[in-house]
Amino acid sequence: MFHSLFSNFLGAVAIGFLFFTAGCGEDPRFSAKTQYLGGVYGGAPAGPPRDTVSYWDGDSVQGKPSITIRLGEQRAYFYKSGVLVGVSQLSTGREGLNTPYGHFSVTQKDVNHVSSLFGDYVDSAGNVVVPNVDITKDPKPPGTHFRGTPMPYFMRIVSGTGLHAGYLPGYPASHGCIRMPEFMAEDFFKSVSVGTPVTITN
């Protein structure tokens, strides 16, 4: 009787183990194909999703520049006289701070731009006391000062909105600006001038 029960127990354990190991490949938590986007990575190496989209082939192409941004795709397309020469991944304005759409043009270029609205409150030693603040809404704690967020290769298109180098978590996350990988922001920056048309579609 005891021997029979023990044999049944061992059989159940073996079957359970087989189901568990067979299921690991199908469970996305154990799949090598799992991609974690921004914020919580569930034990995966930290960092944004791999960029397999962005490229630049415009250095040897002549022609009038223009940019088309497609918010639904989170991509920017750079043209010279109608010829596509570059594509960039983006992170545009998050919900409630949406990037505007319409027809614009580059109104300012600033390679070392720093935001006057968004950044951190820091102490006298430069330590962050309150991160990610909007100075129009977030009160400044005593003994701190505002330090604006760097926005390299800034290309302003309207009011406080522009294209610039920034972090891309894999989804719309900005305060309204159009973030790009730094190497793409640099290529776009050197290829536009004030007046370059920028079309943003939804």
What is each model feature region?
Residues 2-202:
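N-terminal pre-domains immediately preceding structured catalytic cores
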